[in-house]
Amino acid sequence: MPHDGHEPPQRIIRLIAVGAGITGLLLCAVVPLLPVKQTTATIRWPQSATRDGWVTQITAPLVSGTPRALDISIPCSAMATLPDSVGLVVSTLPSGGVDTGKSGLFVRANKNAVVVAFRDSVAAVAPRPAVAAGNCSVLHIWANTRGAGANFVGIPGAAGILTAEKKPQVGGIFTDLKVPVQPGLSAHIDIDTRFITAPTAIKKIAVGVGAAAVLIAILALSALDRRNRNGHRLINWRVSMAWLAQWRVILATPPRAGGASRIADGGVLATLLLWHIIGATSSDDGYNLTVARVSSEAGYLANYYRYFGATEAPFDWYFTVLAKLASVSTAGVWMRIPATLAGIACWLIINHWVLRRLGPGTGGLSTNRVAVLTAGAMFLAAWLPFNNGLRPEPLIALGVLFTWVLVERAIALRRLASAATAAVVAILTATLAPQGLIAIAALLTGARAITQTIRRRRTTDGLLAPLLVLAASLSLITLVVFHSQTLATVGESARIKYKVGPTIACYQDFLRYYFLTVESNADGSMTRRFPVLVLLLCMFGVLVVLLRRSRVPGLASGPTWRLIGTTATSLLLLTFTPTKWAIQFGALAGLTGTFGAIAAFAFARISLHTRRNLTVYITALLFVLAWATAGINGWFGVSNYGVPWFDIQPVIAGHPVTSIFLTLSILTGLLAGGQHFRLDYAKHTEVKDTRRNRFLATTPLVVVATTMVLCEVGSLAKGAVARYPLYTTAKANLAALRSGLAPSVCAMADDVLTEPDPNAGMLQPVPGQIFGPTGPLGGMNPIGFKPEGVNDDLKSDPVVSKPGLVNSDASPNKPNVTFSDSAGTAGGKGPVGVNGSHVALPFGLDPDRTPVMGSYGENTLAASATSAWYQLPLHWKESIADRPLVVVSAAGAIWSYKEDGNFIYGQSLKLQWGVTRPDGIIQPLAQVMPIDIGPQPAWRNLRFPLTWAPPEANVARVVAYDPNLSPDQWLAFTPPRVPVLQTLQQLLGSQTPVLMDIATAANFPCQRPFSEHLGIAELPQYRILPDHKQTAASSNLWQSSEAGGPFLFLQALLRTSTISTYLRDDWYRDWGSVEQYYRLVPADQAPEAVVKQGMITVPGWIRRGPIRALP
């Protein structure tokens, strides 16, 4: 190369790029292995003594289930103090928990032996007489990564070792020993805190210097770009202002689509802002919000609902952003700001860059009004149903688009710095979630053109500089993933998640598309089917057009082919995600909008060639609409409230919309077939290039997409307006905005009414009545109804859910059958009640004050009972706002009607109103049937709104009739009551620790999720559950103890009861339920353990054994 005055600066910049690239690459490579500061936590026992001087028990539910190591020593002399019959020497879980023997360590003594068992596997047995005689000195128990074992020191043959899989779950130390603190009595629990890490000084320096080196390398590469454009230096880089000017964004400004572009901007942005207020939430809003909220106390981003508390790394930086937002406010309208901003950014990129790149110049795609409007409509049709929540798909969609734009800029301007920046954006996108991997698709499809640029500049820049900078840019992934975690911890987290699942192999990715066709799930709704089907139609349609015609005038061939490649590669990369939820298609929303414009533009060109082409195009769209509308208009959770057709296919005038579109598609298909055969002999088949025909050729897709958008927005708007002032997401968002995000505005917690004490609202019989031996509830002469007439087994009917339900640990290829009942509603025996019943009562009803009558077992004659009259509250009409219901707790099969008029078969139970006349005689008034939200035959609260009562009514009674002799057809009931209610916010407040299930957490921003600290979970006092079906199909499965969810320690340490709840003025609604937790071992007997905190430095490759992730 000839020498000139510019060569030394060129060489210097090249050397800077090489040096910075090598530095960044090496530092990024070593960051995963660099040491971190790990917070340690240990528990030593005994910790204190009771008032009698005996050792106390302690409570310490470990998030990981098992400790890193456990060591317990019990003097044999202490064991000798236990009663001769049965006693608990020591255990790591209380005896009364659910299946605690299968999970914990239990050392039990009976009159013959002392048995040490890990997870129901016996490790050692010692004869009780030998222990009592003092033949052993101490019982030593241990569990670590090498195994679990026990040894009665001094007794031959009384020792044993089990495998490491028998390491016990620890929820504390529990014992029946009545001994003082003494030498030799000890327990040491080393909590597994491997994920609670912080970077050491050397790691911070490496991360900072590595990131700076990569940035310098990219800037140096950008300087080389400037000097190599057109073969000479563009500016004098020594001049400071000129040096700054070289980083300005230079964009071509071809003619635009005039007002259409502005209309599209206004329409899309206005719709996104409106959707931010009224739009549906996503299935993981509660999941991600809770992970973010507890991260500060936990010390890392822990998976709260599953996976034994494993870190969210390598996909954790987005949760860090959510945690920062949650520190300001947890209101949904605030937390969803990133998603809305991502949507706005996506559209602006599409309209103001992508379309210009795909079709510049006069007559090009970017100047076609219909194409621009189609892009906007298709973008909204893809964005609204998928990307309005806290899931990462909105940011992934933005990252995919931005990466493609930077790659195209690198190709168009031959600037390798843009390619390096695209690599950085792709890396950030890929670390949002597994499906973020699709961001590298644009890099792969643009790699060939970028390689050609590198080859062309080899003589001036060499190969080393650009390749090192690009490699360093890609290596930034290690800084994002391992900035505070290590290679070992991230690897362990991945191992646990793949071990626990659900994971579906890449060759089964067809299940993702199958889930779109499942009718009853929100993921198979028509609004989610439509954008995916249209994307596939557009992509393959454009592909056929380009293959057949090579190019379309006004459409840039290279960028279009790369866009097709990017989309196809993205769909291929999606196969490598471990889960196959249909909601992950939201990551393609930006590409869907772009393809809408390309398809409208390209199909308009070919549709003018023959009428057949236009007819085929319309047929394809009609078929897509038929397939899409075969799904329900369903949304997730509370977003369904008030939405038309949320659980059925859309219907117009009694006819399914899908049948209408299918019929039309068949007719147009037949027409297209006729037009095709007519081509063989017709003299003229080309469509005249008139304004009318151009309109017909260009508008089908924009009309269809706009209609779908209007349907989506209209559905949610209708629900918000028609239901007001009943609860909706829109109402909660508007209330939060009006209050300025005040913490006193608490969304659903302000509308859920609770009945903390159902006995307080119990109605009393009118004095002076005569009734039989069964009391006032049975009335004068009950036939077939008796106090014991309730089945012992009241488990509700099974819940059958279809495959593809998000956050459901069920089979992906067959229906899932599950059972779930609110605590205390599934039957059983209880203490003797006031009328001699042994029935276990639900909802906290006091058996000393609450009689029961039921017809179970009466299979020979028609059963009937009319209770005595019960006095309604005085001045009930004035207090109806605070006490709006009469409630009867009932079980069995009861006839009722849903809000839409559909009936539920059962036997008759009615409430009859009455009025006491001046002479003391009660005059019966109207009878009303109950509102019964189910499920049968479990205990539930039948609702009778007081607005149904005649104004003069002041008494009421229960009228039951069961003429059906089938053993499954019976009913039982308790006395009526007018509940004393308070809102859920008033009951729980904002400081009470609560377990909020995944589906409910985002709806209760004021409630505090129970915290995790130093690897120990805080025990919640309440649980907020979603509706019955969601609880059975999702919550109870995803949060299970086998999967490392919170049930791991909650079911072992707590018992539950259900609190009666109602959604204000929405009495037909099964909004969910609230359960109250009680410790099996009270806090005064087993206080929270005192934890000793420490700090150690751990190299990045040290694993220290696996976390036990087995059932």
From Swiss-Prot:
Ranges of Polar residues composition bias in the record: 808-823
Protein keywords: Cell membrane, Cell wall biogenesis/degradation, Glycosyltransferase, Membrane, Transferase, Transmembrane, Transmembrane helix
Top-rank EC class of the record's enzyme: transferase
GO CC annotation, single: plasma membrane
EC number: 2.4.2.-
UniProt membrane topology term: Multi-pass membrane protein
Localization (cell): Cell membrane
Record field: transmembrane: 12-34, 205-224, 333-355, 370-387, 394-413, 423-445, 462-484, 530-547, 554-576, 581-603, 615-637, 652-674, 695-717
One BP term from GO: cell wall organization
Spans annotated as Disordered: 804-831
One Pfam family in the UniProt entry: Arabinose_trans
InterPro entries (alphabetical): Arabino_trans_C (IPR032731), Arabino_trans_C_2 (IPR042486), Arabino_trans_central (IPR007680), Arabino_trans_N (IPR040920), EmbABC_dom1 (IPR027451)
Molecular function terms, GO-annotated: arabinosyltransferase activity
Function recorded in the entry: Arabinosyl transferase responsible for the polymerization of arabinose into the arabinan of arabinogalactan.
Family: Belongs to the emb family.
Name recorded for this polypeptide: Probable arabinosyltransferase A
Gene this chain is encoded by: embA
